[in-house]
Amino acid sequence: MPQLIPPQELYSLLLWFAPCFTQPSFAHFVSFIVCFCSGLGRLTATTVYRTSPRESHWTNYSRFLSCYRWSLQALSARLLALLVKDCGLWRDDQGRRRLCLVLDETLVEKTSKRMYGVAWHRNTHGGLCRGTHLLGHYWVMLGLLVRLAGQPRCCPLAFRLYRQKKRCPAAEYRTPCQLARELLESLLWPSGPDLVRTVLADAGFADSELMRWCVQEGIAVITRGRIDARVHDLYVQQSGRGRPRKWGQPISLAEFAADENNFTQTIALYQDRTPVQLASVVGRHRQSGLVLRFVILRTADQAPVVLMSTDLSLTPREIAQLYADRFQIELTFRELKQHFGLGHYQVRKPLAMLRHVHLAGLACALTQLLSLKGMTRKTSAGRLKATPWRRSGAPSVHETQLWLRWACERRGLFGKWPSPGHLRKRSKAPQRRSQAQNHQWKSAEL
């Protein structure tokens, strides 16, 4: 394998994380991130050792994951500060800055039954062709929703491993919603006078305890609800006799969605390709006891979708747009599994497992930042030929990974970026010897 030397653009980003490590540990950290960003082969500690130009024993890279002293919490905090500094924050209609975090889970297939945390989990993402259950790890991820070159993207921040109740001690068992709360508690949030923290999640994290905790901590929650949810009117009419009533008249969301007059707004979501009709109502959720805004989304030939928001100041259009941007975390899972070695770890210690996954997420986030810088050079210098299927926008994560691999192998900067077609031809073409090497080879045969 070739030795990978990071270019200046990537190394300047890696220097941001130097306070989290000692000098020897930072050198191993650079080797891991450069290897993961390049995406060469199966991304394990052995691959990092083979591609690193440093003279170090191969066991040092395994011990960097299992027993070296460095904090994942500090690494996530530095990454969050870097993303906020370089990408900025989204502003709502009232001019407030919103720090949008995304929660979701994914499955990583593993065949070893002796590996820590491996169990059979219900498959809700891979399709029926792969079976209803998969053997592997169940990861809960927290990501930051940013906009790069006008397009929303999700950058991974932190991970937690879910273990089934029957496979761990009772004191160590945590549900996915409890793991999500631990991720939010461990994150070092930035501060600001007009900063609003917002969490986006799917229906799997619509837990009443998690929502109440977020409201107590001043965190807004936007999640998917049920069409048959028990909702009550805010106005409580008292009869004058007996104990005072706590709940108003019930509101049926199914009947509310069946009335055509309630859908007063139409917007376009998912890159302005899908027209969606919106209807909104404010009520008190019976299960959580919170006052929520319920937004009903209706598209052609689809069942209505119900969204719940604890922030009543957000308009229905903003709630629908933010939840549509939440889908970027699914694309991030695909990039992590296909190009950044999310499931390539071959370790048994839980700490080494968790650190490997965190480094893969960090490499994915830094590659997305480099794709933004690549787009800036593309528009200014015109050195990159645009792909025929994308008229405008930043390069994809995989294209940036190919260019980064070329720069690391050539020890060059991002001044001369090759086209993706040149990279494909270069990977398929056989290596030719120069005239001097050919003459030396013939003389050696004689």
Residue ranges of predicted features:
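Gly/serine-rich nucleotide phosphate-binding loop at the start of the catalytic core
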Residues: 1-73, 79
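Active-site-proximal, Lys/Arg-enriched surface segment
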Residues: 69-163, 275-281
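Extended, non-catalytic structural segments that build the interaction scaffolds
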Residues: 31-38, 303-327
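A short, flexible helix-boundary coil/loop motif
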Residues: 1-28, 36-37, 148-161, 173, ...
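Domain-level cores of phosphate- or acyl-group-handling catalytic modules
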Residues: 166-241
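Short, conserved catalytic/metal-binding motifs centered on acidic residues
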Residues: 48, 97-111, 142, 197-206, ...
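Short amphipathic alpha-helical "interface-anchor" segments enriched in bulky aromatics
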Residues: 107, 254, 316-347
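Electropositive, glycine- and tryptophan-enriched low-complexity nucleic-acid-binding patches
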Residues: 59-63, 125-195, 291-306
